[in-house]
């Protein structure tokens, strides 16, 4: 079943610290020569690069075995692999084939102009859409021929998978304008499936029908790719956000509420991946991070990989959250080649920390957590086997004027890793964390602090429990800022104490700072 990573997928132990190029950034060798070195300089280890069917097969090629690769144009593919190899970058190719953002505008001209051979999907009113019908065998065979040729060429160009480590099949598959295809071929399949009798006739039932149909189509490409050149394969999804109904967003793609239909229809796909642009980053991640479950026979349901996310000043802390909370396979802001230095700075800083943690084999730990805070969602409490950790946004501390002057808070975030009893690493930006025993936490005082970190005014304290504290307390034994070398060894940089720990009350990383802190605790 889907979700069981193939042998090649299981070898993706290094995190994908990625960035996706804008749609037209790899349409010439000159662009490729210019953009890939810039991606390396930003700290990426992987670039997601479109592979354009319309440029690869401008003239329709024969499907005969003898000529199947002779006249495909792989110039851009070859240049991407060559430059990436020189820059020590990995590549994930994005197959812009029959569908890109639902539509079929990356198909070659000969495909677009022959709607008789390659029919379009239709609305219930009979309106043709710029969406090729997934029920047409001609559509499938043309797509399959080109994608198979691409996979064979990649196998010849990069046989050991040193550069190309994964493939995306199509891009944000889904229906728009209509929840399902009503073309004659689609109606025939709909009746043969007895779909209305099984699921009803509303738009949500229509979406399920299309999800299974799209998945079955993709399975043909995935199965062929697996036989030609075995590597991880995934499909990505545009989210169903803002209360939109099927047909108002790219419906029937690999969305969280349709995962079972995609599992059934496309068992050769390794990952279903969310493209996250709207608010609610943590919620979207949770829907796609599906851990081991007994009913899956101990197999991973779906591992989180984010191939597209809005590239912004908050991208870095979001990456740390995804790796810390969900042991993500990778993170990739979209159109990073067009982003401003202000937007890419957080990505570079976060990837520097993540690369160090990877050196120390500290990613994908079972005992790790992710934090992501903003002005409304500003605190999380975790009980780690008797160690109660309260992590907050840095601006919950009163002495930074931006905390109270009406400024919009940038997101703060981090990942916390348990190394052992009373031993943690905190990596991130814009967070503060304290540690208490459960008894201590239950009886902690609630107080309003002034800018000096003490009670704002005398008597401004309320105590939850006035009984005498029983049991032990936790204190900070040491807080060291560290780096992690290429060989995985931890390198001491400086000791945080005094004002930097509020006299032993907490560990913190300021807004705009990017650090790894090694925190040790003790009981007293």
Residues covered by each model-derived region:
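C-terminal beta-sandwich/jelly-roll accessory domains of carbohydrate-active enzymes
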Residues: 401-408, 425-524
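Catalytic-core region of carbohydrate-active enzymes that cleave or remodel glycosidic bonds
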Residues: 89, 220-227, 257-364
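The substrate-binding groove and active-site-proximal loops of carbohydrate-active enzymes
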Residues: 16-28, 53-75, 124-145, 153, ...
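Aromatic- and carboxylate-lined catalytic core of secreted/periplasmic carbohydrate-active enzymes
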Residues: 317-442, 453
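N-terminal carbohydrate-binding accessory modules
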Residues: 3-46
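Aromatic-lined substrate-binding rim segments of carbohydrate-active enzymes
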Residues: 32-116, 214-230
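Polysaccharide-binding and catalytic clefts of secreted carbohydrate-active enzymes
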Residues: 107, 112-259
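Short, acidic/polar
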Residues: 25-41, 247-265, 281-285, 316-319
């Amino acid at each position: 079943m889907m979700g069981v990573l193939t042998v090649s997928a299981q070898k993706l132990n290094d995190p994908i610290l990625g960035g996706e190029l804008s749609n037209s950034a790899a349409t010439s060798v000159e662009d490729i020569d210019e953009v890939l070195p810039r991606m390396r300089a930003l700290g990426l280890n992987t670039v997601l690069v479109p592979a354009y069917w319309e440029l690869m097969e401008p003239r329709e090629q024969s499907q005969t075995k003898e000529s199947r690769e002779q006249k495909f144009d792989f110039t851009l593919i070859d240049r991407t692999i060559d430059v990436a190899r020189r820059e020590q970058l990995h590549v994930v190719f994005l197959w812009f084939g029959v569908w890109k953002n639902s539509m079929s505008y990356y198909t070659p001209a000969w495909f677009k102009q022959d709607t008789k051979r390659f029919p379009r999907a239709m609305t219930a009113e009979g309106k043709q859409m710029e969406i090729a019908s997934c029920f047409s065998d001609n559509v499938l065979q043309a797509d399959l021929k080109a994608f198979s040729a691409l996979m064979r060429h990649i196998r010849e160009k990069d046989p050991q998978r040193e550069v190309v480590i994964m493939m995306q099949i199509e891009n944000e598959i889904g229906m728009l304008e209509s929840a399902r295809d009503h073309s004659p071929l689609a109606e025939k399949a709909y009746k043969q499936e007895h779909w209305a009798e099984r699921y009803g006739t509303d738009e949500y039932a229509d979406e399920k029908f299309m999800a299974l149909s799209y998945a079955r189509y993709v399975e043909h490409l995935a199965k062929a790719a697996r036989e030609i050149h075995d590597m991880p394969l995934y499909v990505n999804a545009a989210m169903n956000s803002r209360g939109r109904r099927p047909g108002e967003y790219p419906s029937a793609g690999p969305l969280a509420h349709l995962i079972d239909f995609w599992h059934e229809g496309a068992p050769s796909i390794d990952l279903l991946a969310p493209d996250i642009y709207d608010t609610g980053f943590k919620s979207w991640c949770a829907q796609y991070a599906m851990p081991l479950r007994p009913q899956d026979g101990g197999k991973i349901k779906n591992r989180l990989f984010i191939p597209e996310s809005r590239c912004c000043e908050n991208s870095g802390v979001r990456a740390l959250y995804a790796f810390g909370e969900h042991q993500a396979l990778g993170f990739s802001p979209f159109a990073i080649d067009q982003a401003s230095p202000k937007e890419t700075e957080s990505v570079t800083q976060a990837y520097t920390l993540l690369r160090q943690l990877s050196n120390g084999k500290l990613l994908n730990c079972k005992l790790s957590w992710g934090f992501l805070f903003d002005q409304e969602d500003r605190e999380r409490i975790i009980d780690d086997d008797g160690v109660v950790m309260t992590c907050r946004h840095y601006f919950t501390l009163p002495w930074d004027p931006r905390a109270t002057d009406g400024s919009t808070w940038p997101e703060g975030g981090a990942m916390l890793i348990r190394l052992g009893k009373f031993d943690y690493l905190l990596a991130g930006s814009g967070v503060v964390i304290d540690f208490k025993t459960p008894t201590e936490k239950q009886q902690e005082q609630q107080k309003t602090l002034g800018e000096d970190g003490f009670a704002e005014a005398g008597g401004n304290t309320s105590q939850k429990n006035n009984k005498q504290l029983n049991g032990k307390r936790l204190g900070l034994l040491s807080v060291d800022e560290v780096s992690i070398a290429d060989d995985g060894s931890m390198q001491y940089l400086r000791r945080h104490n005094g004002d930097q720990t509020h006299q032993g009350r907490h560990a913190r990383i300021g807004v705009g700072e990017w650090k790894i802190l090694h925190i040790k605790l003790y009981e007293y």
